[in-house]
Amino acid sequence: DISSEDPSPCPVFEEDSMQVRADAIARRYEGERRLMEAVARGDMRAADMVEETTLRLERVPNKLRNRKNLFIVLNTLMRKAVEAAQVHPFYIDAISAKWAMRIEAVEQEADLYPMRREIVEDYCRLAQTRSMASYFPNVRSMLTYVQFNLAEGISLEAIARQLGVN
């Protein structure tokens, strides 16, 4: 029964609506990719890109929970960005855990907004100070070994043994 009060959806309009959604999703993913690349380079201007990417979605009705979820996603994206910059997981995990706890501790939505810039800048600084992307894998391994074993008596022989080189 076709009624003028409740017309059936027109397939063309459904496709248009789906296309609009698909385009918006593709733009969001592209924005996330650009943001992650900028953070991996340690580019502090990346903080200006955040609002364009992940923080505009409405996934759940509870506004605070929705924003916290989006900030957790942001934290995860930033973590993956600096991982791509060859930052050791030890350093990534420390910052990721710090932000996860701070995000969950927030009780008012407005308190989250200043964090977005802080989160991105924190990860940018991590990429600037701890990225080993410019080193060959064996040099990265050696540097990591030295960083994590400074309190031990480190010798050239111990490093060579650890890395399996002579």
Language-model segment annotations:
Residues 103-106, 124-134, 143-154:
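Basic, amphipathic alpha-helical hairpins
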Residues 89-94, 134, 156-157:
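Short acidic alpha-helical/loop segments enriched in Asp/Glu that coordinate divalent cations
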Residues 95, 135-138, 162:
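Short, conserved alpha-helical segments within structured domains
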Residues 157-166:
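Append "Primarily bacterial transcriptional regulators
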Residues 27-30, 137, 141:
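Alpha-helix N-cap/N′ positions at the starts of helices
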Residues 1-123:
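Hydrophobic, helix-rich cores of sensory/ligand-binding and other regulatory modules
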Residues 67, 112, 135-139, 156:
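The cytosolic transmitter module of two-component sensor histidine kinases
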